[in-house]
Amino acid sequence: MTRVVIKNANLVDGTGTPTRMADITMQDGLFIEVASSGSAGTMGAERVIDADGALVTPGFVDVHTHYDAQVSWDPWLTPSSWHGVTTAVMGNCGVGFAPAHPDRHQWLIELMEGVEDIPGSAMTDGIDWQWESFPEYLDSVASRSYVLDIGTQIAHGPLRAYVMGQRGADNLPATEDDRRRMAELVEEALRAGALGFSTSRTPLHKSKSGELVPGTMVGAEELFEIADAMARIGHGNFQFSPEHIRVPNEEWVWMR
């Protein structure tokens, strides 16, 4: 068993209580004791770290990242891992890389490049495309090791283009069959381990060529059907970037 003791830490524990000096003991990667400074025993410890008053905090959870491509090549997921982030959530803003027909790969790269200003050349060189469906994307991510925990959502942009083809990419209305199929794929994604679903309704989000993210112009009916699918599963986060135009935004009415 591996035992590590951090002594003389200026602890910020995340509960809202004031900082305090403390000793922290970990065993096999788990915190087992937080004690007053100077009181922790070090016998049997493989490592003793003197924090010397440095701040020590729990790992940060970054609920809004866009590592959807970077997970293909970067086990460190920088820069998050440089700044105390221990859990990152991706698949935000309606953009991502699954599900994906092979002929949509470059289009999805240019969509992400436009929305998030991530160099397309890096994504083209780095993504290995070992998937088509969203569950296969999760399998690809799960087959790799990272220095922090990650979770992802199924994004509206790739979902719409996967089901509807160019009609979906062009933000044309979905048919009843389209909506049903998108809802089925969201259910499938949640059952496979997706944290939820994301969409973007802001015209500020555009592809490299200036196209709006698929889903930007859809009405309530399409989003409600997806929300109903999530309700049938019984869990899942529904994340959206609001439209930023009308005040109050239409989405607030939908949430009632």
Protein language model annotation of sequence segments:
Residues 55-79:
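Di-metal (Zn2+ and/or Mg2+/Mn2+) metal-binding site signature of metallo-dependent hydrolases
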Residues 135-138, 142-146, 171-256:
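Histidine/acidic residue-rich metal-binding segments in metalloenzymes
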